[in-house]
């Protein structure tokens, strides 16, 4: 159960993804104080709640472009979980790579399939860049940064770039990256 610390409750919150992911951004904005439990999959996130390793989980269930995320609704139903809150996050996709590289030096870009789909129009200007699907937006940014992979970019949040990489194209709310 949550531990009371001053005026705030300190709790363990599971997310699918890593720091800098959109689930992490929701967690930071929604909870006043928390310990983050990074999960590889939504199944792992649900297991952490069922096993009482976490008090809460942050899970996307709607996407304004793709609609309902039915597999996540199925997990909620299958494990009889309750939705206890809601947070709407405006998603801004940003292109990032190792510091010092330019977009002309990028041969491939990795990200979640939905992020790649939403940025397709932008990449028509860069036909040499191969788009490659990965399981999470921020996770591949982390991998590029940790392994110092040259010539490879990621599409993720600005916060992921702040943690792991360097921005080379910033999404602007009035002129979306996609």
Q: What spans do the regions from the language model cover?
A:
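Single conserved hydrophobic/aromatic residue that forms the stacking wall/gate
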Residues: 169-178
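Positively charged N-terminal leader segments that act as targeting/secretion signals
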Residues: 1-8
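Paired acidic/hydrophobic, glycine-rich loop segments that form the ligand-binding mouth/hinge
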Residues: 55-59, 150-156
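A conserved helix-loop-strand patch within extracytoplasmic ligand-binding domains
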Residues: 78-139
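Short, well-ordered beta-strand elements
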Residues: 11-17, 107-110
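Short helix-initiation/N-cap motifs at beta->coil->alpha
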Residues: 37-50, 132-143
């Amino acid at each position: 159960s949550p531990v009371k610390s001053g005026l705030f409750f300190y709790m363990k919150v599971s997310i699918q993804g890593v720091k800098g992911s959109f689930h992490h951004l929701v967690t930071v904005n929604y909870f006043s104080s928390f310990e983050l439990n990074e999960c590889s999959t939504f199944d792992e996130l649900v297991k952490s709640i069922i096993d009482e390793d976490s008090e809460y989980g942050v899970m996307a269930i709607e996407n304004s472009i793709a609609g309902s995320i039915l597999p996540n609704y199925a997990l909620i139903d299958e494990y009889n979980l309750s939705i206890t809150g809601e947070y709407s996050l405006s998603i801004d996709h940003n292109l990032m790579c190792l510091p010092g590289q330019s977009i002309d030096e990028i041969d491939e870009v990795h990200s979640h399939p939905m992020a790649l789909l939403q940025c397709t129009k932008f990449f028509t200007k860069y036909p040499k860049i191969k788009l490659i699907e990965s399981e999470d937006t921020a996770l591949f940014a982390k991998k590029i940064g940790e392994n110092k992979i040259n010539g490879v970019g990621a599409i993720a949040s600005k916060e992921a770039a702040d943690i792991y990489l360097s921005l080379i194209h910033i999404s602007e709310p009035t002129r979306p990256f996609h």
